[in-house]
Amino acid sequence: MNEKIKLVEAAQMRADIPEIHPGDTLKVHVKVVEGDKERLQLFQGILISIRGVGMSKTITVRKISHGVGVERIIPLHSPIIEKIEVVKRGKVRRAKLFYMRNRTGKAAMKIKEKTTNSEMA
């Protein structure tokens, strides 16, 4: 990529994004503009994919709302993202968790939780 493009992108990239991996349960605070008002909307779900590099990096977060699966593709460095919180770390063996789309009921949101060294002590 051109050096000038890299410089412009580096200036616009966010530094407050936590380390996230597929299988993590996230809370994404999204700014929503309705008329002349602006409010925060919370979207909590499982991170099922990460794609792209740099400014074009996006994440796909999936949740079950009233028995219906809802997925949201979110650009990571977008100004509409207020903050991203990691609720819990998931232990998965895949980079893309598209198989979660075929699950129903409780199994649709069930992922093993990753244990850390601080929890073991």
Swiss-Prot record:
It holds the Pfam family Ribosomal_L19. The keyword Acyltransferase does not apply. One of its GO terms (cellular component) is cytosolic large ribosomal subunit. GO terms for molecular function: structural constituent of ribosome. GO terms for biological process: translation. InterPro entries: Ribosomal_bL19, Ribosomal_bL19_CS, Ribosomal_bL19_sf, Translation_prot_SH3-like_sf. The keyword Lyase does not apply. Keywords: Ribonucleoprotein, Ribosomal protein. PANTHER family: LARGE RIBOSOMAL SUBUNIT PROTEIN BL19M, RIBOSOMAL PROTEIN L19. NCBIfam families: rplS_bact. This protein is located at the 30S-50S ribosomal subunit interface and may play a role in the structure and function of the aminoacyl-tRNA binding site. Belongs to the bacterial ribosomal protein bL19 family. This is Large ribosomal subunit protein bL19. It comes from Chloroherpeton thalassium (strain ATCC 35110 / GB-78). The gene is rplS.
